[in-house]
Amino acid sequence: MNREIYDFVAIGIGPFNLSLASLSAPLRGVRTLFLDKKSGFDWHPGMLIETSTLQNPFLADLVSLADPRSEYSYLNYCKLTNRIYSYYMRENHYLSRAEYTRYCQWVAARLPNLRFGCDVQGVLHDPESHSYLVTGQHTMSGQRFMFRCRKLVLGLGSQPYLPACCDRRAAPFIHSADYLRHKYELQGRASITIVGSGQSAAEVFHDLLRESGRHDYSLAWITRSPRFFQMENTKLTLELISPDYTEYFHDLPEARRQEILTQQNSLYKGINASLINQIYDLLDEKVHDGDNRYTLLTNSELRACRYDPLQERFQLDFQHLDCDRPFSHATDGLVLATGYSHEIPACINPIHDRIAWNADGSYRIGRNYAIDHEGSEIFVQNTGLLSHGVTNPDLGFCCYRNSQILRELTGTEHYRIETRTALQEFSPPADGVLKHRPARRAERRPTVAARPLMDIHRATL
């Protein structure tokens, strides 16, 4: 047993906990440990499609919105890997998924507080020492381990969600999370169907559409959504993923929060507008060239999925929601781009009674992201959609959340936590009267002689 007592141990190393590790590593006197059963950092490897990009700009890296001077920033990664000038010349603020993964792997290799290949199998509470024991097994050697800590952070991520009618044991369908691993096998089928409407579904459809000229498959994209809608990214709308809105959202009654989330799908479930346009343009070219192998259909809910192993075909039953009419669909290959869901990890079963639970069995998450009854010992990442809203899965918000979590874990605000970030109001005035803001008194400004305009961005000295 390791006799060192850590200030906190974090379980799971995805982007959110990797951000927390990056922000906590420089803090003197703060002893931390991050554990993951994988052999190294690997973020959605099945969706590292060549043309796929993040929907956040590069500033939403692991650290910059909390500490722009951090050695773990994306720009420092570019500088130290001799890529900063090529990135500057590209003038593209959106990273590919593959580039973001390379950046995260670069950071992970430099952090001293990460331990991969550690399968956490149990978490116990020791009331005498007021500490937690994190136990498990090294995946390579099989050797047992035990670490003691005062606090915990759970960042185990989400699991592929499957519709209730789809039984993985009975049918060899593919979830989009595993798409690349099965792509070439899939392209050997006579027909392929994608079910789902979000970014992942669009990326898979676009990838198969681009390469369909080299193959003979027919391609269908079917979704329950009423349309193939784009993700909203206008500036005032984006303030709904600001710290100010998160505070406002958390204070609303739970029933109202549930209603609001159903209205905000386009904030976090939509498709990048440029990708929608690329799909349309490519479809238009193919149709005008006489290639009509493609079907897109909305308002269609999957009700049943059967697989015939002799014919190696899927038989799908749908219900068209607008017309209230059923229809069937046969296909040789099936990709379910049906999103992800959170599962309670079995390793925390021994401390179940120390955690606050909602009636539906989910965590009751406090404003500070704590889930224990005291609100000060056990914290979670990326499981608070109902409690904190659409900022929960957003990469750009992780620095703000981690700055808050670090303050709760250590008792010190190591990184400034902004309290006023939005240009708009979300709550009505407390006194019931909305007043105009006072006009700013005009200041006399010095007169400067006019100078010729020039493009200083491209100026050469």
Curated annotation (Swiss-Prot):
Gene3D superfamilies: FAD/NAD(P)-binding domain. InterPro entries: FAD/NAD-bd_sf, Lys/Orn_oxygenase. One of its GO terms (molecular function) is oxidoreductase activity. The keyword NADP applies. Pathway: Siderophore biosynthesis; alcaligin biosynthesis. Keywords: FAD, Flavoprotein, NADP, Oxidoreductase. Its EC number is 1.-.-.-. One of its GO terms (biological process) is biosynthetic process. It holds the Pfam family Lys_Orn_oxgnase. Its cofactor is FAD. FAD binds at residues 9-15. PANTHER family: L-ORNITHINE N(5)-MONOOXYGENASE (PTHR42802:SF1), MONOOXYGENASE (PTHR42802). Belongs to the lysine N(6)-hydroxylase/L-ornithine N(5)-oxygenase family. This is Alcaligin biosynthesis enzyme. It comes from Bordetella pertussis (strain Tohama I / ATCC BAA-589 / NCTC 13251).
